[in-house]
Amino acid sequence: MRKWILTWILPSLLHRSCFHIICLVGTLSLDCNDMTPEQMATNVNCSSPERHTRSYDYMEGGDIRVRRLFCRTQWYPRIGKRGKVKGTQEMKNNYNIMEIRTVAVGIVAIKGVVSEYYLAMNKEGKLYAKKEYNEDCNFKELILENHYNTYASAKWTHSGGEMFVALNQKGVPVRGKKTKKEQKTAHFLPMAIT
């Protein structure tokens, strides 16, 4: 008789405990919905203004990141005070600090913070700097599997292929016509300013 009572009571006990767990989880989710985004960000251990650099959220538009772009060829692109684009190996050079502003999904504009010139590419694939923003300043940002980023002109192509921002082993900008996504000259790591 005891065996029959246990098999009869056990399912009802399980259903009650499941019901209590569901009620508890529902209460917790309702509590989270009452939080502001800043409170939720605090609870998940990240701050609202600072997003993870490998997150794709910034590609949705309007986000501004201040970074140094480090090329796999060991150079940082810099935009000088007169607008000359070249590479430098000095990490603490203020002319290599870039403002990367999202202008559309996957499209960014790169601006030298100190020089206030935008990085641009013309139809021949030459990198240059421009004081006023225009379509030449738009680049498609792509995060590769090796954790580096590439920046291809959003406006110009060469024979149907993309033209990338690239620095050779001497820090000289490579013409976009001679670049490919796979080349390490076109791979950049956005580094936070410390």
Curated annotation (Swiss-Prot):
It comes from Sus scrofa (Pig). This is Fibroblast growth factor 7. GO terms for molecular function: growth factor activity; heparin binding; type 2 fibroblast growth factor receptor binding. Its main location: secreted. PANTHER family: FIBROBLAST GROWTH FACTOR. Pfam families: FGF (PF00167). One of its GO terms (cellular component) is cytoplasm. Transmembrane segments: none annotated. Glycans are attached at residue 45. Interacts with FGFBP1. Interacts with FGFR2. Affinity between fibroblast growth factors (FGFs) and their receptors is increased by heparan sulfate glycosaminoglycans that function as coreceptors. Keywords: Glycoprotein, Growth factor, Heparin-binding, Mitogen, Secreted, Signal. GO terms for biological process: fibroblast growth factor receptor signaling pathway; lung development; neurogenesis; positive regulation of cell division; positive regulation of epithelial cell proliferation; positive regulation of MAPK cascade; regulation of cell migration. Plays an important role in the regulation of embryonic development, cell proliferation and cell differentiation. Required for normal branching morphogenesis. Growth factor active on keratinocytes. Possible major paracrine effector of normal epithelial cell proliferation. Residues 1-31 form the signal peptide. The keyword Secreted applies. InterPro entries: Fibroblast_GF_fam, IL1/FGF. Belongs to the heparin-binding growth factors family. It is found in: Secreted. The lineage of its organism: Eukaryota, Metazoa, Chordata, Craniata, Vertebrata.
